[in-house]
Amino acid sequence: MTVTNNEIAREFAERLLAIEAVSLSPDAPFTWASGLHSPIYCDNRVTLSDPQTRDLIADGLASLVRTNFHQVDVVAGTATAGIAHAALAADRLGAPMAYVRSVPKDHGRGNQIEGRIPAHSKVIMVEDLISTGGSVLKAAQAVEREGSTVVGVLALFSYELEKGHRAFEKAGVPLYTLSNYPILIEVAAESGRITSEQQATLATWSSDPQAWSDAH
């Protein structure tokens, strides 16, 4: 997994913390829907409510595309979390935009892809948050079944989990993110939001979330 611009990564991490899109609580962990205990909770929907953060997302995602891809025909968001961010990026790039449902609709035309992705298009997928990568890679498969090529995935933030690393490597799809978990906890420590001891505790989580959860 790749973050191509460390300055943007640190700035975006600071914004996520400042607007409380990300909360860190190593001493009183959150419980995820899966039942896992986690020291981090990320709600990137909050970013849409802050104009400064939206601008940073739009500019950052567009920069990732221009820097890393020779040709992009369509920007496609994952439903629902990636739709708004895909629209921001597509607008900056002057590119067509579509979105991909997790499953086809059970009525009407039964579409899984909404909007137009012509056959043989080179497509960038946009997701808000990467944990294992399963959702966005499943959406990418739907795009490729229709005859286009997913050339990469962009996301706002990644937990940098080993399971996610393996999934993207197996799929052969490059991932670029605006920021990630190691950078975020570093910024949080430097800004005094967490202690050095808490930073050390947080650093152990991403290497084995299940073991961390079991111990907390």
Curated annotation (Swiss-Prot):
<dbReference type="InterPro" id="IPR004467">
    <property type="entry name" value="Or_phspho_trans_dom"/>
</dbReference>
<keyword id="KW-0808">Transferase</keyword>
<comment type="subunit">
    <text>Homodimer.</text>
</comment>
<keyword id="KW-0460">Magnesium</keyword>
<comment type="pathway">
    <text>Pyrimidine metabolism; UMP biosynthesis via de novo pathway; UMP from orotate: step 1/2.</text>
</comment>
<dbReference type="Pfam" id="PF00156">
    <property type="entry name" value="Pribosyltran"/>
</dbReference>
<dbReference type="GO" id="GO:0000287">
    <property type="term" value="F:magnesium ion binding"/>
</dbReference>
<feature type="binding site" description="in other chain">
    <location>
        <begin position="127"/>
        <end position="135"/>
    </location>
    <ligand>
        <name>5-phospho-alpha-D-ribose 1-diphosphate</name>
    </ligand>
</feature>
<feature type="binding site">
    <location>
        <position position="101"/>
    </location>
    <ligand>
        <name>5-phospho-alpha-D-ribose 1-diphosphate</name>
    </ligand>
</feature>
<dbReference type="InterPro" id="IPR000836">
    <property type="entry name" value="PRibTrfase_dom"/>
</dbReference>
<dbReference type="GO" id="GO:0004588">
    <property type="term" value="F:orotate phosphoribosyltransferase activity"/>
</dbReference>
<protein>
    <recommendedName>
        <fullName>Orotate phosphoribosyltransferase</fullName>
        <ecNumber>2.4.2.10</ecNumber>
    </recommendedName>
</protein>
<dbReference type="GO" id="GO:0019856">
    <property type="term" value="P:pyrimidine nucleobase biosynthetic process"/>
</dbReference>
<feature type="binding site">
    <location>
        <position position="131"/>
    </location>
    <ligand>
        <name>orotate</name>
    </ligand>
</feature>
<dbReference type="GO" id="GO:0044205">
    <property type="term" value="P:'de novo' UMP biosynthetic process"/>
</dbReference>
<dbReference type="InterPro" id="IPR029057">
    <property type="entry name" value="PRTase-like"/>
</dbReference>
<comment type="similarity">
    <text>Belongs to the purine/pyrimidine phosphoribosyltransferase family. PyrE subfamily.</text>
</comment>
<keyword id="KW-0328">Glycosyltransferase</keyword>
<keyword id="KW-0665">Pyrimidine biosynthesis</keyword>
<feature type="binding site">
    <location>
        <position position="105"/>
    </location>
    <ligand>
        <name>5-phospho-alpha-D-ribose 1-diphosphate</name>
    </ligand>
</feature>
<feature type="binding site">
    <location>
        <position position="107"/>
    </location>
    <ligand>
        <name>5-phospho-alpha-D-ribose 1-diphosphate</name>
    </ligand>
</feature>
<dbReference type="InterPro" id="IPR023031">
    <property type="entry name" value="OPRT"/>
</dbReference>
<comment type="function">
    <text>Catalyzes the transfer of a ribosyl phosphate group from 5-phosphoribose 1-diphosphate to orotate, leading to the formation of orotidine monophosphate (OMP).</text>
</comment>
